[in-house]
Amino acid sequence: MPGPPGSLEMGPLTFRDVAIEFSLEEWQCLDTAQRNLYRKVMFENYRNLVFLGIAVSKPHLITCLEQGKEPWNRKRQEMVAKPPVIYSHFTEDLWPEHSIKDSFQKVILRGYGKCGHENLQLRISCKSVDESKVFKEGYNELNQCLRTTQSKIFQCDKYVKVFHKFSNSNSHKKRNTGKKVFKCKECGKSFCMLSHLTQHIRIHTRENSYKCEECGKVLNWFSELIKHKGIHMGEKPYKCEECGKAFNQSSTLIKHKKIHIEEKPFKCEECGKAFSLFSILSKHKIIHTGDKPYKCDECHKAFNWFATLTNHKRIHTGEKPFKCEECGKDFNQFSNLTKHKKIHTGEKPYKCEECGKAFNQFANLTRHKKIHTGEKSYKCEECGKAFIQSSNLTEHMRIHTGEKPYKCEECGKAFNGCSSLTRHKRIHTRENTYKCEECGKGFTLFSTLTNHKVIHTGEKSYKCDECGNVFNWPATLANHKRIHAREKPYKCEECGKAFNRSSHLTRHKKIHTGEKLYKPEKCDNNFDNT
């Protein structure tokens, strides 16, 4: 039964309600970009209708587009443009001062644009709003993803905010209400816009996914692929005017800028810590809940975040997609490659204000600062020993558990820390990465080179507060201090004897094993017994 004048007649929604048809003359007026946009929009509108179960049979227009045929309508001499789906609140809230018929004409005309041809006509098939048909309920949000109605300015009555798209105005109103009516059948996640749900579904189906030829990574969006390719090229077009740091994405630069202005609007209700981004706050909250929803199928280790799991999986697969162009070394994480590159450039942008020492990584500077403050935040519950870094505590705890997960493939020796294994491997390769500029001597460890340099400088920077004795190296000072403290942390499990140095314990253990401490070298001299 028809409604009263000015009301919307309810009826089933069809593809023709959201489609535009061209005559041959009109189609020829469009350039390549406009034609491609038209094809893209028609396909997307059709997919949305199919997803909602509205489109039963495939329209002739879609068949033409799929076959690569020109979609102009031979039977028509002018374009037919039916209005998009609308709902009654648009009449009340968004178009208070305009006739709806005029608004439709302007929206369609500006959305697809005049191509400059004076003979290109546009006719609205419905002469009044009463003739527009909308589905009775459930699809009032469909208009948000129908791009046939762009570039019309609307105003939200709540916030008096101006929008340049019909869809933006409606989605803004939806955000105000906070409703999430579109639910994913696969994982149950809800969205306030159908277009967002459509995008989300591609994650499950991998539909229209884009693969990187460089490393094989699959991405859901072409724009993401373009951004990702910048990682391989090392391209960083977005530069911070404040500190000069460059980024490969504008969004990363925007996040970075908040460091300088120290804007931290997102606060944790649990501990009061504030963050510049909501996403960082969300990640931080997991610390309090202890939630680790992402589990590795290979070793069953669990992680707080999906990105951490992805990085972890590369340990099992041995995948190292990030390669240094300078020396050819491969890395399983892009961040590790970025850190590594600074070795070649010699760049050390992070300087300690206390002693002037410079570092190539901010994390190293933060770690270094704790030497001056004496802060040791990470304490072992087993023996009470405190550490500057959490990684040091993790490695230390393996002393108590006896766990040695890092094994050398060359000789089978196992270690409790990854760094210890890396150092050990250099024994087999005889790799001396770090060379002394003074005498040319090579070392497998940078710390050993640093210690060695003291021989040339004669510098003794480490002084004992107890007796005033000065030492070249902090390790020597630490060992010396145990004399005053009478501390003997290294205990023999065999007889219980304790030592203040691990080297002394190692030497002592050979007494129990019967191993000779010093093995004489083979002597070729012959002696006469007479």
UniProtKB/Swiss-Prot annotation:
Positions bearing the Glycyl lysine isopeptide (Lys-Gly) (interchain with G-Cter in SUMO2) cross-link: K264
Keyword entries, A-Z: DNA-binding, Isopeptide bond, Metal-binding, Nucleus, Repeat, Transcription, Transcription regulation, Ubl conjugation, Zinc, Zinc-finger
UniProt keyword annotation of Transmembrane helix present: no
Ribosomal protein listed as a keyword: no
GO biological process: regulation of DNA-templated transcription
Pfam families in the cross-refs: KRAB (PF01352), zf-C2H2 (PF00096), zf-C2H2_6 (PF13912), zf-H2C2_2 (PF13465)
Alphabetized GO MF terms: DNA-binding transcription factor activity, RNA polymerase II-specific; RNA polymerase II cis-regulatory region sequence-specific DNA binding; zinc ion binding
SUPFAM superfamilies, A to Z: beta-beta-alpha zinc fingers, KRAB domain (Kruppel-associated box)
Annotated Gene Ontology cellular component terms: nucleus
Main location: nucleus
KRAB domain mapped to chain residues: 13-84
Subcellular location: Nucleus
Zinc finger annotations (C2H2-type) as residue ranges: 182-204, 210-232, 238-260, 266-288, 294-316, 322-344, 350-372, 378-400, 406-428, 434-456, 462-484, 490-512
Family (UniProt): Belongs to the krueppel C2H2-type zinc-finger protein family.
Record function comment: May be involved in transcriptional regulation.
Protein name, entry field: Zinc finger protein 680
